[in-house]
A protein has these predicted regions:
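Domain-level signature for proteins that mediate thiol-based redox and metal-cofactor handling
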Residues: 4, 17-20, 39, 61
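C-terminal cap of thioredoxin/glutaredoxin-like
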Residues: 4-5, 41-43, 54-57, 127-201
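A short beta-strand-turn-helix
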Residues: 21-36, 64
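Structural alpha/beta surface segment adjacent to cysteine/selenocysteine redox centers
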Residues: 34, 42-131, 163-166, 192-201
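Divalent metal-coordination and catalytic microenvironments
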Residues: 38, 105, 140
Length: 201
């Protein structure tokens, strides 16, 4: 059941050694100064995360992210005991972020989840999806082979758990947790209430 919980601790922003002034920018949607920040703690192999990404998220993009009300930030929480390929997918997605193509890869990973989720070695399919996302193949291959983004995935997962996330998807919204792939009506109720409280509108 979806429920709103008061989190014990705030989600700590990622620390990155990259050159970006905002290390979360490559995997964020919406204005950096939006009044609400929505952290999505997700697993690329999770079917409920897929349902959110392909069903609910496009509506939120149109009604909240695109209108400047909400900034959405994707945080990796691969539940590898249930989803053994989730970590590989997360690393590929963050490699794509280094080419400013995180969201293209994000969408392809979820749309084609059935094609790679149960493979004993998913790297071939994941790299092929990178080609579909118009990534530099050699750079992506090098990033994946070197496990270059593994520390970022570990940092994401640690911070998600520190915020109180134990399942996916979990959403951290201004001090509270919304668990599960809630219908868009639940997101509207929560986001509208917070937006009114913060802006008076």
């Amino acid at each position: 059941m979806n429920r709103l919980l008061v989190a014990c601790a705030a989600l700590i922003a990622l620390v990155s050694g990259g050159a970006q002034s905002d290390p979360l920018a490559a995997r964020s949607k919406g204005r950096p100064d939006a009044p609400i920040t929505l952290y999505e703690m997700s697993d690329f192999q999770c079917p409920y995360c897929r349902a959110f990404a392909l069903g609910t998220m496009p509506v939120l993009e149109q009604e909240y992210i695109g209108t400047g009300k909400v900034r959405l930030v994707y945080i990796n929480l691969p539940l590898t005991s249930l989803h053994p390929n989730a970590r590989a997918a997360a690393q590929v997605a963050l490699c794509a972020a280094r080419q400013d193509r995180f969201w293209a890869m994000h969408d392809l990973l979820f749309r084609h989840q059935d094609e790679w989720a149960k493979l004993p070695k998913p790297s071939g399919v994941l790299l092929a999806l990178g080609d579909s996302a118009h990534l530099d193949h050699a750079a992506l291959d090098a990033c994946v082979t070197a496990n270059a983004t593994a520390p970022e995935v570990d940092a994401d997962a640690a911070r998600a758990r520190r915020a109180g996330a134990v399942s996916t998807p979990t959403f951290y919204i201004e001090g509270g947790l919304l668990e599960g792939a809630a219908p868009v009506t639940v997101f509207r109720a929560v986001l509208d209430s917070i937006y009114r409280a913060k802006t008076g509108r």
